[in-house]
Structures are given as structure tokens and as C-alpha cells.
Design a protein with these regions (language model features):
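Extracellular adhesion/carbohydrate-recognition regions
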Residues: 1-93, 164-170, 176-183
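An exposed tryptophan-centered "aromatic clamp" motif
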Residues: 79-98, 102-158, 173
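Extracellular carbohydrate recognition
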Residues: 159-163
Length: 183
């Protein structure tokens, strides 16, 4: 079930600057916080593909990924427009946003209606329905492809890095909490 997470002391104020984001549950038991600002971006310009040092992984490995921060950082280092967009958002409480894991991207497309219903209550928030129905993940499938979630068809597949699909800023909450405990 999706819900709005407010910044401390700003509960009930439905302006973008007063919210941490919209929380959703993932199939694997994790929770994710989505910042309701989106942009259709290339994952990576083909000329920069060799700068992305992450190896391609299978769809199963991409679905099992439980941390998006390292993969987003690798994309950012390679010059990814999608990663650059997602990481410009931060939260004092939850840290830096990144691109979603493949499972989180699939949940975003699956829960689009619930997410948009809450986003309509927040002044300044974007609606997913106004963007491409394909959401980038932070995982590479092959040399020239990244994993995306398709909202039209309800499945994941590898797609060319140069396509402009939704960059959805997201923090995996359980991962963010684990990282705070280690320091």
C-alpha cells in the first residue's frame, strides 16, 4: 500500500518541499521511497557505454538486487543522464535517491495508479501517467542494453541505453537503514 511520508514537523502539508516521498512495498519485503519528480532520460549515451563498468546481468540477478546505490553510482560515473537526474534529489533522513532496482521499477509500473493518486494531493509533484510507461532500472542487461520495466505489458526486458524512459528517483528504505547502522 502506498503512502505519503512527510518531513519531520511538516505532517499534513501537501507541498513537494514538505514530503520525503511516496512509500511503496516491494514483492521481496523491502520498502521503497519514490520522490515524485520524473524525467524521460537516456540511461546512457552509446558513446559512454564503455565507461559503464558494470557487467550485464540476467533478469533473475537484476530482480534479486537489494541495493540500488552502487549501481546508480557506477552509472553516474559513466555519465548517465538518468542517474544524474535521480541523484539530484536527497533526503536528510533517507539519503541520496538513485535509480530503482528492476523489482522496484516493476512495482512502480504496477502501483502507478496508487502512486499517482497520492501525488495528486502534493502540490508540485509529477504524475507517472504523464511520462513514458517504461521505467529504467539501475541494472545492465548486455553491452548496449539496460533492464526496464514495462507498464504496458507488465514485464521486464533489456532495452537500448539510448532510449528515453522514466528516471524515477528512489531510495530503498531497508537498505538506507542498514547503511546508517553500519556507520
Amino acid at each position: 500500500m502506498a503512502r505519503i511520508i512527510y518531513k519531520e514537523g511538516l505532517e499534513g502539508r501537501n507541498r513537494l518541499e514538505c514530503v520525503e516521498g511516496i512509500e511503496i512495498d516491494l514483492l521481496n519485503g523491502q520498502r521503497a521511497l519514490i520522490y515524485p519528480r520524473y524525467s524521460n532520460e537516456e540511461l546512457l549515451d552509446p558513446k559512454d557505454r564503455d565507461r559503464w563498468l558494470d557487467a550485464g546481468i540476467s533478469v533473475m540477478r537484476a530482480l534479486r538486487l537489494r541495493d540500488n546505490q552502487a549501481a546508480t553510482a557506477a552509472l553516474l560515473k559513466a555519465g548517465s543522464p538518468a542517474a544524474r537526474f535521480a541523484t539530484k534529489f536527497t533526503s536528510k533522513k533517507f539519503g541520496r535517491f538513485g535509480l530503482p532496482t528492476l523489482l522496484a521499477a516493476m512495482e512502480i509500473t504496477e502501483q502507478e495508479g496508487e502512486i499517482d493518486k497520492l501525488a495528486r494531493e502534493i502540490d508540485g509533484a509529477d504524475l507517472l501517467e504523464d511520462f513514458s510507461s517504461y521505467v529504467w532500472s539501475c541494472s545492465r542487461s548486455k553491452r548496449d542494453y539496460g533492464w526496464i520495466a514495462s507498464g504496458f505489458y507488465g514485464y521486464a526486458y533489456g532495452c537500448g541505453l539510448y532510449h528515453r524512459y522514466v528516471a524515477a528517483p528512489l531510495v530503498l528504505l531497508d537498505t538506507a537503514a542498514d547503511a546508517r547502522l553500519r556507520f
